Curated annotation (Swiss-Prot):
GO CC annotation terms, alphabetical: cytoplasm
Keyword set, alphabetical order: Cytoplasm, Repeat, RNA-binding, Translation regulation
Classification lineage: Eukaryota, Viridiplantae, Streptophyta, Embryophyta, Tracheophyta
Pfam families to which the protein is assigned, alphabetical: PUF (PF00806)
InterPro entries (UniProt xref): ARM-like, ARM-type_fold, PUM-HD, Pumilio_RNA-bd_rpt
Protein name from the UniProt record: Putative pumilio homolog 19
Entry superkingdom: Eukaryota
UniProt record, GO biological process: regulation of translation
Start and stop residues of the Pumilio repeats: 79-114, 115-149, 150-185, 186-222, 223-260, 261-295
Gene3D superfamilies in the record: Leucine-rich Repeat Variant
Primary location class: cytoplasm
Domain PUM-HD residue range list: 1-324
Length: 327
């Protein structure tokens, strides 16, 4: 049903909405079928929120709505969890719900309750996750605290989800509460190895490293010590090790592990499609910051220079050629 064909005028729709006080405490049981969504009123609102051609109509309706009307609209949108999910999991539904967030504390209270009821499902959805992200920016401190607690509880689930990891990264970046920000960072740090080996979780570790928090970087390096070489053989793990090499304190931890392994393993790493980038970066940054470690790597790699040629390690062989006469 196109918005232009909607038989419900703005005043008719809002007049038909229930009083907010009648629905604010309603929490449907798990798996509850959204029977209300079959009513003409719910169908009209669903169409308003999700129709790709209804952008201007939605903007007009919101601009002309007063606080009470917006509150009633929020009440109807969140009166049933399944109905709410059916809206926020669509591209336009998510965007329009985000537009409603921050209008007033009363409106936000309805959306906060709805997000908390289906927190994990919402925050791991491709589109709905942006509702949580937006909520963490515009909600008041009390509502943010409730969401922070839920985020901490589900943080690892979010980190290991393809959409949840993006949401978690944004939430960490925008976190304006020092206590909860530190709690989230500590959770990532303490689970660095597990997350580094996860297809989605490694992006969270990478993100925390790009915040350049010296304490976090050091602690991640310490927690990954002994596993850096193994991670370097993997596509995403190698990205994490490369980032650790960019800061001197964590770089030392990685290079000490490289120097401590047997030469054959270091050679295999240097020939690896992902590991060669780690070795090149180790040579580059040790040369800039720690010449003693740089020469240690050169001497350890030099006996294998002939094996590095015509492989992924050819770029390393070229670097070694420059210093061959000095060894």
């Amino acid at each position: 049903m196109a918005v232009s064909d909607n038989t419900f005028s703005m005043s008719t729709m809002f007049n038909a909405l229930p009083n907010p006080t009648e629905t604010s405490g309603y929490i449907p049981p798990s798996g509850f079928a959204p029977r209300a969504s079959a009513t003409p009123l719910h169908a009209a609102l669903f169409n308003l929120m999700t129709d790709g051609d209804g952008v201007s109509y939605f903007k007009e309706m919101i601009s002309k709505s007063d606080k009470t009307e917006l509150q009633r609209m929020a009440s109807l949108l969140t009166s049933d969890s399944d109905y709410f999910m059916s809206i926020v999991t669509t591209k336009f539904g998510s965007r329009r719900v985000q537009k409603l967030l921050g209008k007033s504390d009363d409106v936000d209270a309805f959306f906060c309750a709805a997000i908390l009821r289906r927190f994990l499902h919402i925050t791991t959805d491709k589109y709905a996750s942006y509702v949580t992200i937006r909520a963490m920016v515009v909600f008041d401190k009390v509502m943010k605290k409730a969401l922070y607690e839920r985020i901490l509880y589900h943080a690892l689930d979010l980190a290991c989800d393809q959409h949840g990891c993006i949401a978690l990264n944004d939430i960490i970046t925008d976190a304006d509460d020092p206590y909860y920000r530190d709690q989230l960072l500590e959770l990532v740090v303490s689970n660095a190895l597990r997350l580094s080996n996860d297809a989605s979780g490694n992006f969270v570790v990478q993100h925390v490293l790009t915040l350049y928090d010296s304490r976090c970087i050091h602690n991640i390096a310490v927690n990954l010590y002994g596993q850096c070489i193994e991670l370097s053989f993997k596509k995403y793990g190698s990205y994490i090790v490369e980032k650790l090499l960019e800061v001197e304190e964590s770089m030392v931890v990685v290079v000490v592990e490289l120097l401590g392994c047997d030469g054959d393993r270091l050679m295999r790493l240097a020939r690896n499609e992902f590991g060669n980038f780690v070795v090149v970066k180790a040579l580059r940054f040790t040369k800039e910051m720690r010449m003693d470690l740089f020469w240690g790597l050169v001497q350890k790699l030099m006996p294998f220079i002939h094996l590095l040629r015509r492989s992924h390690g050819n770029n390393i062989a070229n670097i070694l050629d420059t210093f061959r006469l000095r060894c």
